[in-house]
Amino acid sequence: MDPYSSGEELVVKTRKPYTITKQRERWTEEEHNRFLEALKLYGRAWQRIEEHIGTKTAVQIRSHAQKFFTKLEKEALIKGVPISEALDIEIPPPRPKRKPSNPYPRKTSIAVPTSQVGTKDGKLSTPFPSICENRNLLDLEKEPIIESVGGNEKLSNVQENQNKKNFSQGFTLFKEGASAASVSLGKSSQTLAEPTDSCTLNESVSVSKGVINHDVANKSFPAVESKGHQQLDILDAKQSFQFDSSCNTSSVGKSCQSNEKWAQGEQKDQPSQPDHFEEFSRNDMQVPHNYPRHVPVHILDGTLGANGAQTTPDMFYHKSVSHQVGGLQGLSDMYTNPASSATSEQHSNAARSSIHQSFPCFHPIFTPIRDPDDYRSFLQLSSTFSSLVVSALLQNPAAHAAASFAASFWPYANMEAPVDSTGNNTASQINSAPSMAAIAAATVAAATAWWAAHGLLPLCSPFHSSLTCVPTSATSMQVDVCQPKEGKSEGREGTHNSPPHVQQPGPECSEALQEQHSASKLPTSPSSDSGESEGRNLKNGLTATDTEQGAAVTETHEPNAEKVRKQVDRSSCGSNTPSSSEVETDALEKDEKGKEEPEEPNVNLLAGDAANRRGRNCISNSNDSWKEVSEEGRMAFQALFSREVLPQSFSRSNYLKTKGNIDFEKFQQKPDEQGPSGSQLDLNDQASNICSSHQAVEENVQFLLGNKEGAEKCQPTMELGEIRLKARRTGFKPYKRCSLEAKDSRVANSSCQDEEKSCKRLRLEGEAST
């Protein structure tokens, strides 16, 4: 046996890394000698050894070399002599391994110091907690770490090299506390604060002089002026980019002019910066200019502290938003300190949050709005929206008067055109931008409060009770009483007008509502239909002078509630889908509970029930025509529970008699139910009789006359041209899909149970649904 052919005398391993499958021939002496020659010449270059041997592949050569080297080491270990003395051959050293593609540290580098591990492969490969607090690591891209002691210029060059390679990357920096944002304004040797605890998982940027490279030639990057006393800091990337009101900056794009005008108007309230800041800022302008455009920038104010920031490519400012935010004062006192007076010097320095779109994001319902600037952006919408709101209010004079009166109490400090305290606004004040914005803000706040209470806008945060002016619930009731439909469901039901008796002058309505609110709390109840919610709002919001009209509205709604309760019976025959009448019954029961126990809406319960109420409102408003149980089905349910028989055993004659009696009673009750104000109708009958009203009227006439032949004539109308369908006996059929199943005779049950002809009413297109 060739001693070099195999390593059988070695320890047999359980798993071999590679096995030759095609060529099983052993190595010959000639091949092994050429292998040894090539090994001395080329070392571990297997490709060159393959060319030198010519009969073996590189994989075979490497496998043979592995076995050969293992055999040599074992023989040298047994003899106790070096390998070079055993066979006069030196095993070439292993080639240096490739650099790992993954940034994770190996097991052997656990005890290695942090700096060595971080620069081993040119990438930051240490876990997050092991980064030193006083050292900021950089992703140098095969560049050594430069300590930040006296190395500001070197770090600027390092940043330049980094930005060339990572131009499109953003830097996610984690803020480890408020101490990272503390900056001394008196120091002239530092314009950018170094965060002591700012770290990253993948890359961490040490902030020093020259990090923000301003493009002086193009004037497209926000340039810090000499007397703006701002200091830039890279902090939390999760927050939005916030411009300080005193920062006279030029924004990206074409919004530069509006921001400069707005900032120049606010710059007079700021303290002055030392003169050497101008010289130092000029020096900073000349650092390399290839820093990425969209950099997380933090603007510090000398009086109010720091707010995290981040720029986005789609950032833009509206002129209207700038003017509105600049003119709004004192709104933060609603949450922080109700007793303190709001002055322009106190809040003009606060940072304004950027508006990425025309409408700001709503805050979650569980997190109170603690930042007054966020609340300003929440309420201050664009001038286009304000003009739309005011134009909608002008269509209803009473609603506009109420909104104007509410705007007079609104904490919107109007410096250009203040609103009169009596609520009598002239046309010039209404058309002016600040007054129009105040009216729009009050209207939006009232609608927001109503929606938050009734579930149409679940994400909106409700108002708190720390108001120093008119409470928001009273303000919402002002708008609801004087304009129940225009403010809330104007888009859905634009043709429906409010009743004439509800329109009142704005001051009287507001004063009466203030007295009512001071006497007792106003109950709020969820609504299941827009018409019912309108009636309840009118009933809750009427003043003492309209008590009689309010009683009329109450009497109008009470028969409807009783009728709904009489008509709805919960089925125990296997139909687990509630009809919309059951949903309306639940809503009316909740309404009565809310009237008996008037309580303020719980903030924690609003979030859970708001979505259900919202979905219920949308479905009941738009889809009542097909969700309603048909008239025949409702009559069959009443007959079912009164006679205690199964629906399969209904006979045609008995059902028609029962239905005729019930319809006759309903026909007598309908004229009495319409009430004094003819606009109040039975909602259930109006929705359910869309498709079957003509049939019911014809049947009622025939039953009143007692003519059986007329009933037979009416039967084809119900069957839509005598279309008789074959239906197999499958047990209980829901009356939502098959409203009536009558049999020709009860005697035919025993003979033809498999196939029986049933009178099945086809559904019209208005009711057809899957």
From Swiss-Prot:
Main localisation: nucleus
Q: Where is this region: Disordered?
A: 89-125, 254-278, 483-628
Description of the deletion phenotype? Early production of scent at the end of the light period, associated with an early peak expression during the day of floral volatile benzenoids and phenylpropanoids (FVBP) pathway genes responsible for volatile precursor synthesis (e.g. EOBI, EOBII, ODO1, EPSPS, CM1, ADT, and PAL).
HTH myb-type domain residues are 19-73
Could you tell me one molecular function GO term of this UniProt entry? transcription cis-regulatory region binding
The record's section on Gene3D superfamilies has: Homeodomain-like
As for subcellular location, the record says:
Nucleus
- Composition bias (Basic and acidic residues) maps to 483-495, 555-569, 587-596
Q: Keywords in alphabetical order, please.
A: Biological rhythms, DNA-binding, Nucleus, Phosphoprotein, Repressor, Transcription, Transcription regulation
What is the stated purpose of this protein?
A: Transcription repressor involved in the circadian clock. Binds to the promoter region of target genes to repress their transcription (e.g. PRR5 and GI). Regulates the timing of floral scent, by restricting the expression of ODO1 and other floral volatile benzenoids and phenylpropanoids (FVBP) pathway genes (e.g. EPSPS and IGS1) to the evening. This scent, mostly produced in the evening and night by the petals, attracts the pollinators (e.g. the night-active hawkmoth pollinator Manduca sexta). Binds to and repress ODO1 and FVBP genes (e.g.
Q: Under which name does UniProt file this protein?
A: Protein LATE ELONGATED HYPOCOTYL
- The organism is Petunia hybrida (Petunia)
| Designated gene of the protein | LHY
